[in-house]
Amino acid sequence: HSDAVFTDNYTRLRKQMAVKKYLNSILN
């Protein structure tokens, strides 16, 4: 199911972005 794969990748991408924002907020 390509839709499920897209959702999984999107969720993973969102998590990575959230982690980067979190780290930036700590470091700055």
UniProtKB/Swiss-Prot annotation:
Q: This chain belongs to which protein, by name? A: Vasoactive intestinal peptide
Q: Which gene encodes it?
A: VIP
One GO cellular component term: extracellular region
Q: Which SMART domains match?
A: GLUCA
The alphabetical list of record keywords is: Amidation, Hormone, Secreted
Which compartments does it reside in? Secreted
Query: Record keywords: Ribosomal protein included?
Result: no
Task: Give residue numbers for the modification (Asparagine amide).
Answer: N28
Record keyword Secreted present: yes
The domain of life is Eukaryota
Q: Name one GO biological process term.
A: adenylate cyclase-activating G protein-coupled receptor signaling pathway
**What are this entry's molecular-function GO terms?**
neuropeptide hormone activity; peptide hormone receptor binding; type 1 vasoactive intestinal polypeptide receptor binding
Spell out the family assignment given in the record's similarity comment: Belongs to the glucagon family.
UniProt xrefs under InterPro entries: Glucagon_GIP_secretin_VIP (IPR000532), VIP/GHRH-like (IPR046963)
